[in-house]
Amino acid sequence: MAPPSEETPLIPQRSCSLLSTEAGALHVLLPARGPGPPQRLSFSFGDHLAEDLCVQAAKASGILPVYHSLFALATEDLSCWFPPSHIFSVEDASTQVLLYRIRFYFPNWFGLEKCHRFGLRKDLASAILDLPVLEHLFAQHRSDLVSGRLPVGLSLKEQGECLSLAVLDLARMAREQAQRPGELLKTVSYKACLPPSLRDLIQGLSFVTRRRIRRTVRRALRRVAACQADRHSLMAKYIMDLERLDPAGAAETFHVGLPGALGGHDGLGLLRVAGDGGIAWTQGEQEVLQPFCDFPEIVDISIKQAPRVGPAGEHRLVTVTRTDNQILEAEFPGLPEALSFVALVDGYFRLTTDSQHFFCKEVAPPRLLEEVAEQCHGPITLDFAINKLKTGGSRPGSYVLRRSPQDFDSFLLTVCVQNPLGPDYKGCLIRRSPTGTFLLVGLSRPHSSLRELLATCWDGGLHVDGVAVTLTSCCIPRPKEKSNLIVVQRGHSPPTSSLVQPQSQYQLSQMTFHKIPADSLEWHENLGHGSFTKIYRGCRHEVVDGEARKTEVLLKVMDAKHKNCMESFLEAASLMSQVSYRHLVLLHGVCMAGDSTMVQEFVHLGAIDMYLRKRGHLVPASWKLQVVKQLAYALNYLEDKGLPHGNVSARKVLLAREGADGSPPFIKLSDPGVSPAVLSLEMLTDRIPWVAPECLREAQTLSLEADKWGFGATVWEVFSGVTMPISALDPAKKLQFYEDRQQLPAPKWTELALLIQQCMAYEPVQRPSFRAVIRDLNSLISSDYELLSDPTPGALAPRDGLWNGAQLYACQDPTIFEERHLKYISQLGKGNFGSVELCRYDPLGDNTGALVAVKQLQHSGPDQQRDFQREIQILKALHSDFIVKYRGVSYGPGRQSLRLVMEYLPSGCLRDFLQRHRARLDASRLLLYSSQICKGMEYLGSRRCVHRDLAARNILVESEAHVKIADFGLAKLLPLDKDYYVVREPGQSPIFWYAPESLSDNIFSRQSDVWSFGVVLYELFTYCDKSCSPSAEFLRMMGCERDVPALCRLLELLEEGQRLPAPPACPAEVHELMKLCWAPSPQDRPSFSALGPQLDMLWSGSRGCETHAFTAHPEGKHHSLSFS
């Protein structure tokens, strides 16, 4: 077939691909990879599942199952994408045309630097796509450009870029057809490779101009053709250049309404979803998109009918909930648009966070539902299957069932067998026939299901290499498991599996909590007894800036007769002091005077079990569903942090708000108290059925899976409204209950009973993640069970506030915090210019608001206010995992004062954290912090921001494995025409962290931040020891000269080549990095983008992931590092 000429119709024009007279068929178009028309798959009458159509299209295109999740089906005009679960019905008089396209995009598809598929080792990471996917992506992009689907401007720059793309396209054609450029141009016009708007523009030019353009294209084509690049390299270059021409083309946008709006302009909004940015939104005329969350931050997505009547009855309300319980609500004009959005977010979540999770069944891929039902992995590679068996102990007979990475109709069974040399791993092939039966190669007869086939193997019917093998245990998929199905992006940590190791026991010196003096506490009445404590109501008195503060608190005093459990009691306090979440009780601190006393916020309505006993059957099912869903949110937060609670029960669930006048109830999970790991068997038996069975077998084992068992028991407790039937049994019968693997009596509500049964599975690995629990609870909330079970449904339905409480603030600007709702809790820090306080933003006035850190100025003159506003604007524009999150601002009366509201990180600054926990922080952890700070600074540099105050005191600790850069009070944005900034009024400055050019000429740049980063490395590896701090070391070098200013003497030392010494036991490679950062000339210092890979390599080497020499710094000897 002749190549396309200038007049040849371009795909995907329906007139050249389908006849309008064709009826009663469904057609799926694939982008044309050659000179011919697009390939078409046709399907006849009946129902067709969208995912099945995608599989057929993938087979026809040569797409492997590993890459299947990047694709989806869309309408011809791309106005609507279909979820994998969509069913197309083909009738006699209907013809439907669909496009099979890549829907899920990531930046820099082709290298491993910015994004890649996860590998067991860094050198085993693989690219996101392979060559067939690359060819498909090229054909898709080219079709969009030449058909005019991709909007392209007509500026001179854009015209030049489009002509460059045409040259690459022509060079690719010449490679494919083995033609010389001159021969190709005889049959193909370069204008056939341009967008229609540019073709029309060129056609209107004079003959001389058109001739000049043709000559330019011909010369450029000859130069490109002379290169040795193959067709795939030319495709990759084409795609990269096109993505630079239209950087926003990889994102999808959705026009939505805002709930509660009465129509009109103010009720409109826009959602944007992108693989490298997550979800962003804008409202009304606002042009700047506000980031809402990245995909790993999503906990829950729900779809329900919008509360409207009349023509808008088809509208759907989609609610997205973040890990911090903030919600985004958007109203879509119909169900297809809502499902399209949810399917997009759902797919990105599986690609970036958890390949086995789905947020709602309406968009769940049927193949994924089959995998969940059959306990089967997706198309993971053999390396990950073997690694999973090794992680499980390489027990003979253990196996992994997975989809084939090469064939859509095959499964692979990887089995661990024992031979004289140790464990070995064998593979078996399972084929699915067109009729739906399964046949394992080596077995004589097919089976109707995978479960039936594997049951045969469990009975010893499996032979591998002539050896009979009996299957013993299945290594099932776990939430957030790392595999080749996960895409890792630079600046994002790969997902952490929820299956964590048993909780470690910390020494008393390693615990973290605020110590409260005894004379600041006021004791009131006794409220009862806990298992190991006496409980009182009280008040805490503080004096802040000369103002007396009084806070109502709960005092939990450790009983003197249980002093052997003191350490575990303080561990619980340490746990609660390191978390900040609205559904977790706030711990003010611990009073160590006399008997240890835990000081907590006071929750007025008390434990939920006592409340339910008082109200009896008057509490509707919808109210109880809200309670258990909020409890699931709290436990999901702890699961994401890898922190087991260990003592989940209704008595630990406190009711902060009863819920009335359309608002839902609000609960808080209390501290765990004494851990099951230190309790005797008798005490553990007393906690049956809330304590997980594995905790009785191995008392030291406390995992996240135990919390799921306790949650299931608590759900039963809440919905039954009666005393737990097992609690009154004698200890022997309680133990027998577990030994016989009995279950609690099943509620009449079948779906609820199934959820409880899944949470209380006797095999810990069988229990669902809390994200999955929240998803299942959503389906219960949307059901009609309460109409059958509530005593007076007619009276309760109008007051059933399932969502109304959350909608009260949906249309307000979430970044504006009303000052009167910021409730002071304690002071976090105070400096020369300002102070930072811990506050609760509580607009409902019932202690249900989120904890935030609030910064305010000490002196509020015009200059300070201007600098403070600049700091706020800088922080507001920064969005990185390694920079403290901006929440908003709070204005005083008449906007005469301003406060900055940020996320609250309970562990405080890195300097204090290193000093407190030096004993358990090794070099590997310090290198992890260094790498994260470097990534944060690299991001700042990309935004042309100079920090100017980078020091350990300005790094905050989110968790023991995550730090964030904070305090942008001195930060500056570089001018567009310069790479440095000259400060005219330096003021008070941290001179011992400053580069020489900053000290001498007040010049600040990204290179001066690199110098400060070297000082931060020094701080890290000295653990911020005050005796050898940067200031102490430099002052020691200066000697006793009092007449010379410290700044001048410091500058003389630096110009003489004096530098901070190598920290004790600091790895030589790290000290070499410090010295590179301290190069006298800014041009000689490495960039943060060059430092990042070096630190990552050192960190990987310290963890044993790569072969790397990692030695302590010997006296006077150094090892050199090279940067490429």
From Swiss-Prot:
Impact noted for substituting D169E: In T(-)B(+)NK(-) SCID
Classification via PROSITE patterns: FERM_3, PROTEIN_KINASE_ATP, PROTEIN_KINASE_DOM, PROTEIN_KINASE_TYR
Gene Ontology cellular component terms for the protein in this record: cytoplasmic side of plasma membrane; cytoskeleton; cytosol; endosome; extrinsic component of cytoplasmic side of plasma membrane; extrinsic component of plasma membrane; plasma membrane
Membrane association type: Peripheral membrane protein
Keywords recorded for this protein, A-Z: Adaptive immunity, ATP-binding, Cytoplasm, Disease variant, Immunity, Innate immunity, Kinase, Membrane, Nucleotide-binding, Phosphoprotein, Repeat, SCID, SH2 domain, Transferase, Tyrosine-protein kinase
A Pfam family this chain is assigned to: SH2_1
Annotated phenotype, changing Y904F: About 40% loss of STAT5a activation
Positions of the FERM domain: 24-356
UniProt domain Protein kinase: residue ranges: 521-781, 822-1111
Record has Kinase as a keyword: yes
Domain SH2: 375-475
Effect seen on changing E481G: In T(-)B(+)NK(-) SCID
E.C. designation(s): 2.7.10.2
Post-translational modification: Tyrosine phosphorylated in response to IL-2 and IL-4. Dephosphorylation of Tyr-980 and Tyr-981 by PTPN2 negatively regulates cytokine-mediated signaling.
Disease note: Severe combined immunodeficiency autosomal recessive T-cell-negative/B-cell-positive/NK-cell-negative: A form of severe combined immunodeficiency (SCID), a genetically and clinically heterogeneous group of rare congenital disorders characterized by impairment of both humoral and cell-mediated immunity, leukopenia, and low or absent antibody levels. Patients present in infancy recurrent, persistent infections by opportunistic organisms. The common characteristic of all types of SCID is absence of T-cell-mediated cellular immunity due to a defect in T-cell development.
Record text on subunit structure and interactions: Interacts with STAM2 and MYO18A. Interacts with SHB. Interacts with CD69.
Name listed for the protein in its UniProt record: Tyrosine-protein kinase JAK3
Organism this protein belongs to: Homo sapiens (Human)
Gene for this chain: JAK3
